[in-house]
């Protein structure tokens, strides 16, 4: 399983920017000090149509 977090940062005018990261600390580093509205955990899986 590929466990990640999704971090959301408000960009203004009801728009959010989101990133996938392996840990909340990595998400904070990727946003370079910008305020993070929320962090959610998720599991990414490969999709196979067969």
Question: Where in the sequence are the language-model features?
Answer:
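Short aromatic-glycine-(Arg/Gly/Cys) micro-motifs in beta-strand/loop hairpins
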Residues: 1-14
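A short, exposed loop/beta-hairpin motif centered on an aromatic-Gly-Thr core
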Residues: 13-22
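A subset of signal/propeptide-processing and intrinsically disordered low-complexity segments
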Residues: 11-13, 30, 35
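Short, mixed-charge low-complexity intrinsically disordered segments
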Residues: 32-50
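Residues marking helix boundaries in flexible regions
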Residues: 7, 20, 37-40
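Short, surface-exposed linear segments at secondary-structure transitions and domain or protein termini
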Residues: 24-30
């Amino acid at each position: 399983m590929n466990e990640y977090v999704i971090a959301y940062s408000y960009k203004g005018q009801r728009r959010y920017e989101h990133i996938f990261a392996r840990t909340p600390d990595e998400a904070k580093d990727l946003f370079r000090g910008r305020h993070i509205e929320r962090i959610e955990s998720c599991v990414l899986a490969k999709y196979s149509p067969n």
